[in-house]
Swiss-Prot record:
Belongs to the MurCDEF family. Its EC number is 6.3.2.9. This is UDP-N-acetylmuramoylalanine--D-glutamate ligase. It is found in: Cytoplasm.
Amino acid sequence: MELRGRRVCVTGLGVSGPPVARALLKHGAHVTVVEGRDDDVNRERARTLRELGATVELGEPTTLPAGTDLVVTSPGWRPDAPVLVAAADAGVEVIGDVELAWRLRPAGQVWLAVTGTNGKTTTVRMLEAMLRADGRRALAVGNVGTPVIDAALADGPDRWDILAVELSSFQLHWSATVQPHAAAIINLAPDHLDWHGGMEPYAAAKAKVYGAGTIRIVNAADPALRELAETHGDPAAPLVGFSLDVPRAGELGLVEDLLVDRAFVANPRTEATELATLADVTPRAPHNVANALAAAALARSIGVAPEAVRTGLRNFQPEPHRIAHVATIDGVDYVDDSKATNAHAAAASLAAYPSVVWIAGGLLKGADVTGLVRQAASRLRGVVLLGADRHQLREALDTHAPHVPVVDVARTDEGAMAEVVAAAARLAQKGDTVLLAPAAASMDMFTNYIERGEAFAREVRALAG
């Protein structure tokens, strides 16, 4: 992709904007960055980029900078943003940071991609551990720390041969030619529907992960996902399933307590290879075992040895606030899954424990929690609700779990989490799990899910003395 002399507009100064601008400048482009928020953080970022030669405009952009012939947008920017509408009207190509990284990547660099509603970060981290255990120069990138553009263009001793790429529906929406060697859709549930305009375009965005020639790896337990892979992927590329069931030929799955590969073997009809045991997967919740199988399928697609899959799983350390055990107090386990910000993630978390005091609530973003409550009702010892939309959860609980005691915490100040944890401790009995799996976003009370999880863990430790 030739960029020298081109006039490129970059939208946004968030996580992806600055590294995209730096990469474009390095390739000789004339760069203008537009950012709607004029605050201290963005003024400092703007100062740094101006020193490198970029033009930066702070304040809500309404027009496309004159002469622009390419737009690289930050993934969260909606297609109806005025500057992007102006680009479309002018016939100017709009791509995302991932698409730019793909076009500029060095020859021979392999991409293995993961998308889905929940579990993406865990899966790419597991994959990274497997690849490194096999001696590969590999890095997990995307929403997990290192921006894709930085990793793809790193050179010298920092160059990466394989990228385990976490891709959101936003990033995929703005991608046109990305063709990973293999890609997995690990699950799909309603999320970001306001941005995409409904479930069908959301699913179609996810399916763009299957480029021409991409090995299609899909959760075989979900017929809708298999259909998505069949209808949107390359029909000439292999289709590999994974599930928690005994695998059929061409799948990865479970045989008793063994993770088994019947896809990447010489004769899938008659052969199977043991990859690991359930004891190698941490935590051993069902949805996390599915993540491990997806990661294993991606690793095996490029010939990673079975022993490296096992070693990688053993070396893997879960990310904070994802089914993280905080403490055991008086026989009660306290678990932080603050990252469970939607109903699908909360349902998976709740399914991992037989008897739960559930801490839930926050911003539901218009999601329907009726099915979640109905599904979880038999596991609930009690519920503690907090946050702006807790009344919606209360209504669902009153209808589908009327026998379950509910404590409603109305306060939203710094002491709210202490009251929440204390109430949960009163409801819990020996052998129970107090589980923070809010099924909601956190911004009504906290900066993000991390701050919410840290507040929970802090109050649990205080309870332990």
